[in-house]
Amino acid sequence: KVKPLPGSGFLKTNIDFCIDWARQHKVRAAVYGVCFIAALEYFSLPNNSLRELQRKNPRITAMMEQREQEADDAGARFAVQQTWVPISRISPHLVHAVIVAEDGTFYEHSGVDWYEVEESIEKNFEKGKAARGGSTISQQLAKNLFLSTSKDPMRKLKELIIALRMEKLLSKKRILEIYLNVVEWGNGVFGAQAAARYYYGVPAASLSASQAARLAVMLPNPRYYDKHRQSSYLIRRTGLILRRM
């Protein structure tokens, strides 16, 4: 008869406890699992590139490259419309509208809104697919600069890690400035200055509150709203953001 290894009963008891706990707390278990994998991934992501952003403006982003490749694969023409401007030359209305629409706790979190992460995981479990993102402005910037629009869980994990690093290296003002200059606002349209010119024929500094609210509402799906500018949802959501500003 084979004798059990010393301590094997204790180990089995603890493993069983962990399994039972995970079954009863699926969302929390998923969050802790993500955090554990994040710790393993932490040292493999762009740190030097983030440091450079303290003083250098990015010339091209992963999102721009992705859109260019998609157009090339489809045999379509594609040109990036973007003009960099300092945040001092972007309408305060737009800055406020984007924060209200995309990340109401921007000045309170450290790159990741963990409550939103847990909520999105719970919603995605319920629907059985990646239906809700819960991304902060910092996470969105990480995706735009270094990653892609893929819904691969590992991509999302890297987004979280980069966002946390970014907040340690860059000020909130700098994060906003970069975000507002590189975020996608339509087919080939990137950044506030290009968006203001493209949709309203004015510089970013001259955007009104209503124009800013409309642009902010477009951010989750800019290429769709570029083609559906009179969408009833877009109009309703714009009114809501205006009232919150």
Language model regions located:
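Juxtamembrane regions of bacterial inner-membrane/periplasmic proteins
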Residues: 1-244
